[in-house]
Swiss-Prot record:
F(1)F(0) ATP synthase produces ATP from ADP in the presence of a proton or sodium gradient. F-type ATPases consist of two structural domains, F(1) containing the extramembraneous catalytic core and F(0) containing the membrane proton channel, linked together by a central stalk and a peripheral stalk. During catalysis, ATP synthesis in the catalytic domain of F(1) is coupled via a rotary mechanism of the central stalk subunits to proton translocation. It comes from the Eukaryota. In plastids the F-type ATPase is also known as CF(1)CF(0). Keywords: ATP synthesis, ATP-binding, CF(0), Chloroplast, Hydrogen ion transport, Ion transport, Membrane, Nucleotide-binding, Plastid, Thylakoid, Transmembrane, Transmembrane helix, Transport. This is ATP synthase subunit b, chloroplastic. One of its GO terms (molecular function) is ATP binding. PANTHER family: ATP SYNTHASE SUBUNIT B, CHLOROPLASTIC (PTHR34264:SF3). It is found in: Plastid, Chloroplast thylakoid membrane. F-type ATPases have 2 components, F(1) - the catalytic core - and F(0) - the membrane proton channel. F(1) has five subunits: alpha(3), beta(3), gamma(1), delta(1), epsilon(1). F(0) has four main subunits: a(1), b(1), b'(1) and c(10-14). The alpha and beta chains form an alternating ring which encloses part of the gamma chain. F(1) is attached to F(0) by a central stalk formed by the gamma and epsilon chains, while a peripheral stalk is formed by the delta, b and b' chains. One of its GO terms (cellular component) is proton-transporting ATP synthase complex. CDD domains: ATP-synt_Fo_b (cd06503). It comes from Euglena gracilis.
Length: 183
């Protein structure tokens, strides 16, 4: 707007007719006062418009920065809260992990101790069973050998006279059994 008015004054001054002379050395004080007053008036309006625009821009920038600061502070506060919560959760997980490990260790230890007791009992039972089995086999072998020796000895000593004597004793026992009354 100021530039348009200034161009008009230049055109008028170059027309060589009635107008405003913009050459400072050729003008008189009145013309100079009019030019300076006009420049001051339009310059003041332009400058005040520029200053108002700049003021609005600066205020807007300050408000934006203030908003960003508040937003950043809010984000920082939320981040600190999240960090504290994460630290608490990590501590809780760590303590739960330690507790779980200790419980698991106790459970495994008691399970191993029970397994050891069971194995010892099984070992004792197997040893007893094997001992009884061995004793039975030894007894059976001894009995078999004793019977064979006794039979061999009896067969060696057996003659007709002893044979008759044994038969007679057996017959007496049988007859005594028949004579005994049954109640």
């Amino acid at each position: 707007m100021v530039i348009d008015n200034f161009n008009i004054f230049t055109i008028i001054s170059n027309a060589k007719t009635f107008g405003i002379n913009t050459n400072v050395f050729e003008t008189n004080i009145i013309n100079l006062a009019i030019v300076v007053g006009t420049l001051f008036y339009y310059g003041k309006l332009t400058l005040s418009d520029l200053l108002k625009t700049r003021k609005k821009t600066i205020i807007k920038n300050i408000l934006d920065i203030d908003e960003k600061i508040r937003s950043s502070q809010s984000s920082l506060y939320l981040a600190e809260l999240e960090f504290e919560n994460a630290a608490k959760k990590a501590s809780l997980i760590r303590s739960n992990g330690t507790t779980f490990c200790l419980k698991s260790f106790d459970i495994i230890r008691s399970s191993v101790n029970e397994d050891i007791k069971r194995l010892k009992q099984s070992k004792r039972l197997i040893l007893r069973t094997e001992d009884k089995k061995s004793v039975r086999e030894i007894f059976k072998n001894l009995y078999s050998q004793a019977c064979q020796k006794a039979k061999a000895t009896i067969i060696k000593r057996l003659n007709s006279k002893i044979h008759k004597k044994i038969i007679l004793k057996k017959m007496e026992k049988m007859s005594l059994k028949k004579l005994k009354p049954k109640y």
